Amino acid sequence: MAAHLLPICTLFLNLLSVAQGSRDPVVLNRPFTTIWNANTQWCLKRHGVDVDVSVFEVVVNPGQTFRGPNMTIFYSSQLGTYPYYTSAGEPVFGGLPQNASLDVHLNRTFKDILAAMPESNFSGLAVIDWEAWRPRWAFNWDAKDIYRQRSRALVQKQHPDWPAPWVEAAAQDQFQEAAQTWMAGTLKLGQTLRPHGLWGFYGFPDCYNYDFQSSNYTGQCPPGVSAQNDQLGWLWGQSRALYPSIYLPSALEGTNKTQLYVQHRVNEAFRVAAAAGDPNLPVLPYAQIFHDMTNRLLSREELEHSLGESAAQGAAGVVLWVSWENTRTKESCQSIKEYVDTTLGPFILNVTSGALLCSQAVCSGHGRCVRRPSHTEALPILNPSSFSIKPTPGGGPLTLQGALSLKDRVQMAEEFQCRCYPGWRGTWCEQQGTR
């Protein structure tokens, strides 16, 4: 089984040089990339705390900002005239997508994109974060139910003599058609202006697998969710990358359910990508280093079950997002710095190197390793008997030292199969061509 595996010499991997050398598209034809999407520049400017992520294999924007040449995220107030309702129920820009001007939005969006991405050859991640409403009627529950209520009211006003079932059907159709027009139109404009960017919406697809209290929690998407996601084929077809969220709710802390939760969320992204006819559509889950809405940092095990799980499924990488709230005080900045230095950094070096070595050993360097269905617990984590991670004397970047043993290479081939990069094929991605 190991006869095809490439011999790998002793590896001394200086991650600083790797990060500085990656000026090509951020994630294309690389096994696994970590993107630091955080305004941790404030830690240095306001508190004198230098969160130095450049020493790891983490693609960052200059100044560690949310927007730059490697990635740009557009929040709702930063791109066009996104319609929504405030928490008080007041409409902004019409409130509903079917009650707002798409032309005005696209004209404003045109200017916003050029201002945020001045370079026409931008080839980084381009993420749109619209969270007020969801494009499928059935998914607008709880606080988002206002979009269904106001959609019904709009139809009722237009047709006061219609019975309730007619109103419901028309309201649903009008809302979903308008939502599609707004989202697809915004993506299309972005791709026209910056065609090399990896355009997509944060949080899509979702799996809605939040039933953590169930004694037999499987992590699977609830019944009907995949069918609803299949109705968003227009979104997957228009996207150039998928950005599902794998933020870990605090309810998962201390349970054994994290891997199941993440596994099925990432799997749903790959499922819709395949259904859209683009198996090479990059999947880049959004992760946090904290439990969502808390200041509690993830343990090493939770990193394995989120970042490691994403890598095991063949994700192109992960986006590590840190809330502005987590950088407000000197204490929180120091906590982030210590975590990066002692826990996150070494783990990122481990998993990115593991994915790289697996790609070279199993997939001829021309594809990503994807965990075989028969090995549900396998992760691209390096064998501590074969590798060590050590700081460089004098405070330089971490260095990975070691070599894959024959046993390591055989185990990789047993646990992982290949998803070839475009232009390569074969069991081990050893042949050029698409057939």
From Swiss-Prot:
Q: Which InterPro entries match?
A: Aldolase_TIM (IPR013785), Glycoside_hydrolase_SF (IPR017853), Hyaluronidase (IPR018155)
Answer yes or no on keyword rRNA-binding: no
Q: Name one GO molecular function term.
A: hyalurononglucosaminidase activity
| UniProt keyword annotations, A-Z | Disulfide bond, EGF-like domain, Glycoprotein, Glycosidase, Hydrolase, Lysosome, Secreted, Signal
Give the EC number(s) listed in the UniProt record. Answer: 3.2.1.35
Q: Which residues form the EGF-like domain?
A: 418-429
* Annotated compartments: Secreted; Lysosome
- Glycosylated residues are 70, 99, 107, 121, 216, 256, 350
* Disulfide bond positions: 43-333, 207-221, 358-369, 363-418, 420-429
Is this entry keyworded tRNA processing?
no
Active-site residues annotated for this sequence = 131
Q: Where is the signal peptide?
A: 1-21
**Record's family?**
Belongs to the glycosyl hydrolase 56 family.
> What does this protein's UniProt record list under function?
May have a role in promoting tumor progression. May block the TGFB1-enhanced cell growth.
Checking PANTHER family in the record gives: HYALURONIDASE, HYALURONIDASE-1
Q: What is this protein called?
A: Hyaluronidase-1
Provenance organism: Sus scrofa (Pig)
Tell me the classification of the organism that encodes this protein.
Eukaryota, Metazoa, Chordata, Craniata, Vertebrata
Gene symbol? HYAL1
